[in-house]
């Protein structure tokens, strides 16, 4: 589903299913706090897997739209499942594509406030640690608190609201 242009909070889902549902909850909670919010489902963006062989090739058509959506939203929430103890390939590949296009990809990340969250069948802490490291390396300001949820510990509305309060400061 395409995100609306320039929402105050862009909630990015790096997997479908439970993390997309979590992303929708974040977007609704942001709206309840008076912020414009939209959900970007990365699994619906038609980007090929980034490889070094493609680096010199023309950028995929969908990349410009993705870059525009990300640049147009001052705050992000990223909801990502844990894949083999790390970041979902769709998110890693999107970041790689963004990093090789344009002259200053770091401007997309520098000082951008970001909340990270997961619904994971496993622990979920490993993906958030990996994501925090990567986003901090790129210059993002990752909110200190994060949200870990799973079947036995679902995300509470209060936790989502509290994270958004921190993000919207």
Where are these regions (language model features)?
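N-terminal beta-loop-helix "entrance" segment that forms/cooperates
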Residues: 42-60
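N-terminal beta1-alpha1 ligand-phosphate binding loop
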Residues: 2-35
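A general structural signal for well-ordered alpha-helical segments in protein cores
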Residues: 19, 23, 63, 91, ...
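Hydrophobic/aromatic beta-strand patches that form the interior of the parallel beta-sheet core
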Residues: 10, 38-40, 77, 115-117, ...
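Short beta-strand elements in bilobed, periplasmic/extracellular small-molecule ligand-binding domains
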Residues: 34-42, 49, 141-150
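Helix-loop-strand module that forms the ligand-binding subsite of alpha/beta enzymes
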Residues: 58-138
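Glycine-rich phosphate/pyrophosphate-binding loop and the adjoining helix
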Residues: 1-7, 27, 141-169
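Cofactor-binding loop segments of dinucleotide-utilizing enzymes, especially the Rossmann-like FAD-
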Residues: 14-16, 42, 119-121
